[in-house]
UniProtKB/Swiss-Prot annotation:
The modification N6-acetyllysine is found at K152. Transmembrane segments: none annotated. Disulfide bonds join C90-C93. The gene is Txn2. NCBIfam families: thioredoxin. This is Thioredoxin, mitochondrial. It comes from Rattus norvegicus (Rat).
């Protein structure tokens, strides 16, 4: 009840305020004015036309939603897939994840990255024998072709990706 009263007083004081006076009043009133414009286009200057560019963003990283999604987007993928098994509470995962995403993005679509949270998808973690995080799998044509556990530097990640793409 007291919160409603306070909110009501605040809103009425904000709404009932007078416009600013003095130097700032002249600045705000002139800067907010629009030039006169005749619908016939003979007087005044219309604002320039706005252009919007709509290009499709190609994402190289995605979060796995469930088992069928993993099957469809990872196992059945024609493109090689790097699968990052991670957890929200895992410190090393927070370091490796962005590093790995950056390295995958540099491959320009030759490889994609799937992120699997082991707390949300324990069935996938068990199926792929993930015993520690971060665990990264390289999957090509539905088969695991390489794997590592822990943090790697960028040179090691690049070699890992080249081996997968190769």
């Amino acid at each position: 009840m007291a919160q409603r009263l306070l909110l009501r007083r605040f809103l009425t004081s904000v709404i009932s305020r007078k416009p600013p006076q003095g130097v700032w009043a002249s600045l705000t009133s002139t800067s907010l004015q629009t030039p006169p414009y005749n619908a016939g286009g003979l007087t005044g200057t219309p604002s320039p036309a706005r252009t919007f560019h709509t290009t499709r963003v190609c994402s190289t990283t995605f979060n796995v939603q469930d088992g069928p999604d993993f099957q469809d987007r990872v196992v059945n993928s024609e493109t090689p897939v790097v699968v990052d098994f991670h957890a929200q509470w895992c410190g090393p995962c927070k370091i490796l994840g962005p590093r790995l995403e950056k390295m995958v993005a540099k491959q320009h679509g030759k490889v994609v990255m799937a992120k699997v949270d082991i707390d949300d998808h324990t069935d996938l973690a068990i199926e792929y024998e993930v015993s520690a995080v971060p665990t990264v799998l390289a999957i090509k044509n539905g088969d695991v072709v390489d794997k590592f556990v822990g943090i790697k530097d960028e040179d090691q990640l690049e070699a890992f990706l080249k081996k997968l793409i190769g």
